[in-house]
Regions:
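ABC-family P-loop ATPase nucleotide-binding domain
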Residues: 1-18, 231-248
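ABC family nucleotide-binding domain
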Residues: 7-215, 221-226
């Protein structure tokens, strides 16, 4: 008998991150409760400094909470030691950042296969997975190129492929189109829509309402807390309608 997978990809309870103390205490994330179902796309919006990027860093294991709980696929991760947390980042979480964070001295395929190699996969398996992902995101013809030879949209596609290298439970995207023009933004959002349709769980931090409109659920943050939550009921047709806004 097999054990059923947890319904939730991510859950937080009372998640808090503070900086400073006394009168200088800042609550970057303030007692946040969040649940993200498997296969769901959640967008988080809010003004600069509201805590949305800090929230992403906490749930992805890039930073430690001051208090509260984080469960990833039913596993409590806020209590993990540094070594276990580093392993989790390599295997269960994929990151897509605004600034790409590709290694310019490595080829495109070497960038994509790196997380799998670090997680202990064989070079042959890591390379095969990387090439399949590059084909999936439409830049397999750039496998041997350096990132500096790619356009912004192509580099972000490579970053998405790298984030998927270890088939993560959760992909976290922090302003993934912030450095892209409208055409490249449309390409990346179409890719996210394909990921959504394949059942990938996504949490996207963005300032762009059109990008947020492609999600299943929109959460608004202010001063470290959730102040509004809206379920977007348009389904696939609604998301594709939002994408059409980039074409006009």
């Amino acid at each position: 008998m097999t054990t059923a997978e947890p319904r939730l990809a991510l859950a937080t309870r009372g998640l808090t991150k503070t900086y400073g103390d006394g009168e200088s205490l800042v609550r970057a994330v303030d007692a946040v409760d969040l649940e993200v179902a498997r296969g769901e796309t959640v967008a988080v919006m809010g003004p600069s400094g509201c805590g949305k990027s800090t929230l992403l860093h906490l749930v992805g294991g890039l930073d430690r909470p001051s208090s509260g709980e984080i469960d990833l696929a039913g596993r409590r991760i806020d209590r993990l030691g540094e070594r276990a947390l580093a392993r989790l980042r390599r295997t269960d979480v994929g990151f897509v950042f605004q600034a790409f964070h590709l290694m310019d001295e490595l080829t495109v395929v070497e960038n994509v296969e790196l997380p799998a190699l670090l997680a202990g996969h064989s070079p042959r398996r890591a390379r095969a997975r990387a090439m399949a992902l590059l084909d999936r995101v439409g830049v397999e013809h750039k496998a041997g190129s350096l990132p500096t030879a790619l356009s912004g949209g192509q580099r972000q596609r490579v970053a998405v492929a790298r984030a998927l290298s270890n088939e993560p439970v959760l992909v976290l995207a922090d302003e993934p189109t912030g450095n892209l023009d409208s055409a490249a933004t449309l390409d990346v959002l179409r890719l996210f829509e394909e990921l959504h349709e394949s059942g990938q769980t996504l949490v996207i931090v963005t300032h762009d309402e059109r990008i947020a409109a492609t999600a299943d659920r929109l959460i608004t943050m202010r001063d470290g807390a959730f102040v509004d939550e809206t379920r977007l009921t348009g389904g696939t047709s609604g998301r594709l309608g939002a994408l059409a806004g980039f074409e006009s």
